[in-house]
UniProtKB/Swiss-Prot annotation:
GO annotations of cellular component type: cytosolic small ribosomal subunit
Organism whose genome encodes this protein: Staphylococcus epidermidis (strain ATCC 35984 / DSM 28319 / BCRC 17069 / CCUG 31568 / BM 3577 / RP62A)
Organism lineage string: Bacteria, Bacillati, Bacillota, Bacilli, Bacillales
Protein name per Swiss-Prot or TrEMBL: Small ribosomal subunit protein uS2
Family annotation (Pfam families): Ribosomal_S2
UniProt-annotated stretches for the region Disordered: 228-262
Gene3D superfamilies, sorted: Glucose-6-phosphate isomerase like protein, domain 1, Helix hairpin bin
Keywords: Ribonucleoprotein, Ribosomal protein
Gene Ontology MF term list: structural constituent of ribosome
GO biological-process terms attached to the record: translation
Family, as annotated: Belongs to the universal ribosomal protein uS2 family.
Entry keyword Ribonucleoprotein: yes
Length: 262
């Protein structure tokens, strides 16, 4: 059974590309036709590519890896945050701050500041500090949460990036490529697919299309996590079975020894 259906893709408007005058020739192989000056994406190829991306992301999740969701354009912000949180992953849905990946040591100091301000409020310092200073601290906190809240628990590099619109997120992609972090991306007809390891040819401007595909990547992560859980349970059950067998063998030996003694 396919990960996603043609019907789902059609209903979400995934097939609508950009105007023919705004295209990247490298996307030609993913284009089905042109209609009224707009390129129509070949959804048969999209179905296949979604499946490839899904399996890759699921494998990362099965191995305990993390995925950083990146989508700062207005149409992607809500879906990126919601789906990343649903899958327990990291996200950046506002401006990409330079160095999030390549200079994480500096970024982590700014993230640490979030906890520092929270502790100040918890300890009651806001009650004794001058009102103007408290206002400035709250502004600083809101700004930090806005840009870094989605990665505040990211203690190490993610094992993959999921990106909505490579043209918009070129800085994030450049950092990921520098660190050899694989990239999965929703790639429209005006983008360069060569920058992306797992291309999902699709409309990156329609909210429904972005939500559908971002949701599928979150589903892949959750399925992978379930696989990890099942393996852990199975391992525990095997250990318990081994212990039970050893216990039963010991009891049998004791019974035999007792019978022989009598």
């Amino acid at each position: 059974m396919a990960v996603i259906s043609m019907k789902q893709l059609l209903e979400a408007g995934v097939h609508f590309g950009h105007q023919t005058r705004r295209w990247n020739p490298k996307m030609k192989k993913y284009i089905f036709t042109e209609r009224n000056g707009i390129y129509i994406i070949d959804l048969q190829k999209t179905v296949k590519k979604v499946e490839e991306a899904y399996n890759f992301v699921k494998q990362i999740s099965e191995e305990g890896g993390k995925v950083l969701f990146v989508g700062t354009k207005k149409q992607a912000q809500e879906s990126v945050k919601a789906e990343a949180e649903r899958a327990g992953q990291f996200y950046v849905n506002q401006r990409w701050l330079g160095g999030i990946l390549t200079n994480y040591k500096t970024i982590s100091k700014r993230i640490k500041r979030i906890s520092e301000i929270e502790k100040m409020e918890e300890d009651g310092l806001f009650e004794v500090l001058p009102k103007k200073e408290v206002v400035e601290l709250k502004k600083e906190y809101d700004r930090l949460i806005k840009f870094l809240g989605g990665i505040r628990d990211m203690k190490s590099m993610p094992q993959a990036l999921f990106v909505v619109d490579p043209r918009k997120e070129r800085n994030a992609i450049a950092e990921a490529r520098k660190l050899n972090i694989p990239i999965v991306g929703i790639v429209d007809t005006n983008c360069d697919p060569d920058e992306i390891d797992y291309v999902i040819p699709a409309n990156d401007d329609a909210i429904r299309a972005v939500k559908l595909l971002t949701g599928k990547m979150a589903d892949a992560i959750l399925e992978g996590q379930q696989g990890v859980s099942n393996e852990e349970v199975a391992a525990e059950q095997n250990i318990n079975l081994d212990d039970k067998e050893e216990s039963e063998q010991a009891e049998t030996t004791e019974e035999n020894t007792s019978v022989e003694s009598n």
